Amino acid sequence: NNGKFLLRIEDTDRKRSSFDAINIILEGLEWLGINYNDIPIYQNSNINRHKEIANKLLNEGKAYKCWASEEELLRMKKIAQKNNSNIGYNGLWRDKEPTNNELGKPYTIRFKAKKNGETIVNDKVQGDVLFQNNSIEDFIILRSDGSPTYMLSAVVDDHDMMVTDIIRGDDHLNNTAKQIQIYNALDWKIPKFSHIPLIHGDDGSKLSKRHGALGIDYYEKNGFLPEAIKNYLLRLGWSHGDKEIFSETEMIELFNLKNIRKSSSRLDIEKLKNLNNHYIKS
């Protein structure tokens, strides 16, 4: 469809975005032969743009400053857990004016989430997923150190990069409901979303290293071929009849979102090894 594949490194969380971690991503893509257009875009380089949008929302009354202390936040969280509620922040500063005690102290900026009605995620894989707005708390878009959160940065960058289609794990569905509210608050066009099931271990539990969930560099160093890895990942949760072996051209031509299953797939290392043997022999 003549689309572009842009690589964005989401490095706003500086503690988790080391040079080595980023390099593993870049080298892994190169080894797999997954080529992106243009140069990588580092999210942190757009931090001033993210702050600009946070302040725009603040000035328009769609966000607010929050001076809640760690003790207050912990107390709210405990109350929420006791009441079995998803709302960990009770909107303490939503309509509260600061006093001299707060002025000059660090604060976060929270998005003023809608409290009435519902937010619907029109998803290409999951169908329409409905969220009651009273279950979405006022979430932080700018931390007390002035750094933007993923929730805001991803929306701003997707808009500025003219991203039309977002395909990601279904663990992001809750985030998407929040991000749709940001899109609407800014009167920006909402991209098409597709939330695909996560890969689980062979026992059905959350994937971990004991299941073989290791970095792509592990498989490269242990004799796996990139063709086998791509073929195996393609067939996890997606099918085209009974066909098991796909050339790269076939992968591109045949893949579609409508054949993705809603249920989670299980990582089967033995099947991956067998597929790898096929590619070694061919």
Where are these regions (language model features)?
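N-terminal Rossmann-like or analogous alpha/beta NTP/dinucleotide-binding catalytic cores
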Residues: 1-82, 174-188, 228
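Catalytic adenosine-cofactor/nucleotide-binding cores of aminoacyl-tRNA synthetases and other
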Residues: 174, 186-282
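Catalytic cores of large soluble enzymes that bind and process phosphate-bearing ligands
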Residues: 17, 42-46, 65, 112-113, ...
